């Protein structure tokens, strides 16, 4: 067999494959044997029908066509391997020449991974926001914590912002009552904005027993987009009374005995969260800089697949919250064209980032050991709320394990670049990024337990392939580090422990 590769573009090639009939003959013979078992001919036992009889019954041309179709996947695969083509799409195959007893010639066009030429990065410089925490931020956090321990006391006065009211609600559209839009005794914090548009303005200044009617646009349900007439009856007004900010409050709200100890702990936790946010900012800016420095074309099929996947995820999420695409775009204040252009740009950036990081993996010979992979499985299983061994088996059954391994490799490549970068804040101060480290102790024992669930063959590191989750693992690792740190602190201060790294634009 002879294969010739023609480069059509940086992301597309054409293979021309010539197969002598002698090399095709084993496939032809195998097809005759298969048909001899399938075709029933009087006077011949199954599997004993001679080729000449099959030719008479089915036609020599039909049999040769079937032999070629069954041989093409193998021949194509051999040609791809021989020419070392990194395929990213289904091939478009065309048989250009074939006659009985003569050679088979076919072509195959496919999208391929573009060649990425990495520049000498040197010491890349990134500028991020400072990780400082102000006194005002600490006090704001303490106020939020006090808010969680507030008590509600009935008052006999008109409704004010910040009050909690008990409401009876009903709604109608064009005089027709909406059955599933009624509520009795609903508690609502005035001014929070988490009920329906217009409710705050309608009940402002109302007293216990007052009835107010207003119009609002429905954003979900059967009457989405319609204007509804809503009636709200105030059934009680309560004001929120915050506890004094003193040592007694510190004892009640935390493990600390004094207010100063609590205040210091809140500052430490906020600083930890800011370091995680700082890492997320550095990560995103590194990806932006890589795309700026390295020109990478995006294969059409890969971009189309990514856009389709994103549209599918969006549709699933919108269905889950009970709304549609048009309403969602209206909420964003974007036209369909603007939204699609933004998604397309983001998807292209994600794919380019993947290709560049994959090139870094190759250039730096970045590898992956079993322990690193198992740590990721353990972490993701915990976040998914399933047993680690069950999560590992689910990955092994499909292509999830391959995708996870590629993500971890890309994460390592990104962190290597961050380690070698010069990072300063906007005030010119050097920044030491809070890069995650390997776990120890009990975590290592858990990792070893999970590894028993996967065969060694399943842990062979694949060539990094395009994935919609280009740098998700980078965010996951940083989040895991921050979460582990927060878990060691007993203060449950209104989200101080929730240090999720902002999702990368490439995720």
UniProtKB/Swiss-Prot annotation:
Residues 442-460 have a biased composition (Acidic residues). Its EC number is 5.2.1.8. One of its GO terms (biological process) is 'de novo' cotranslational protein folding. It is an enzyme of class 5 (isomerase). It is found in: Cytoplasm. One of its GO terms (molecular function) is ribosome binding. Keywords: Cell cycle, Cell division, Chaperone, Cytoplasm, Isomerase, Rotamase. Its main location: cytoplasm. It comes from the Bacteria. Signal peptide: none annotated. This is Trigger factor. It comes from Parafrankia sp. (strain EAN1pec).
